[in-house]
Design a protein with these regions (language model features):
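N-terminal organellar transit peptides
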Residues: 1-105, 109-198
């Protein structure tokens, strides 16, 4: 393509497709990260590493995260949520479509961090539900092991969301045992977001 030079893909972004990296890099120069996929180990390259670089640079410009995710890996989601909960620079997080499952946990991480402002469009929805983890037979000896592990995962998700939002234990327990779809207006009231965009 004439006039367009492909950038070399840095080793730390090895999980990013080379074509997508061109757009990824251009947005990073504007301190913007678009996350529009399932949560997996790739968040190390696509979210954590850029956020860490921004946190350690000399700029006071806020970082923008555009989030639209169906959720995914519990462990990878908690990796990012725990990091964001104590992030030391300004972040504008914009939910464009939905933040489901572990993406809702990541969203809730900004509830008590004054550096993070979470915005959503009126048509945005958030989904909270019990976590469920698929384990192979080799990873758990018995069904009881799997159930006990899943219960611990559910409890971790529950405690994290309750501690970072206005969601009470009673409300969570009455809603999250099934698929709990939350509108933008309800999310605002529950401190899952800070602002509804027009």
């Amino acid at each position: 393509m004439e006039g367009f030079e492909f950038l070399a893909l840095p080793e730390k972004y090895s999980g990013v497709d080379i074509v997508n990296y061109q757009y990824f890099h251009q947005l990073l120069e504007k301190r913007t990260i678009v996350f529009n996929s399932e949560i997996s180990e790739d968040i190390i390259e696509t979210l954590y590493l850029p956020l860490r670089d921004f946190e350690n640079d000399d700029s006071d410009e806020p970082v923008t995260i555009i989030l639209n995710s169906v959720g995914g890996s519990v462990s990878d989601g908690f990796f990012l949520a725990n990091y964001l909960a104590s992030y030391k620079k300004k972040i504008n997080m914009i939910i464009t479509g939905y933040a489901a499952s572990m993406a809702a946990v990541i969203l809730s991480a900004g509830g008590k961090n004054e550096n993070i402002t979470r915005k959503a469009y009126p048509s945005t929805y958030i989904l909270i539900h019990d976590g469920y983890v698929a384990l192979s037979a080799s990873e758990a000896k018995t069904a009881n092991d799997i159930m006990a592990f899943n219960n611990r995962v559910d409890e971790n998700i529950r405690n994290f969301i309750i501690s970072n939002t206005n969601i009470t234990e009673e409300l969570y327990d009455s809603k999250a045992r099934k698929q709990w779809f939350i509108s933008a207006q309800e999310a605002l009231e529950l401190n899952l977001i800070d602002e509804i965009m027009e």
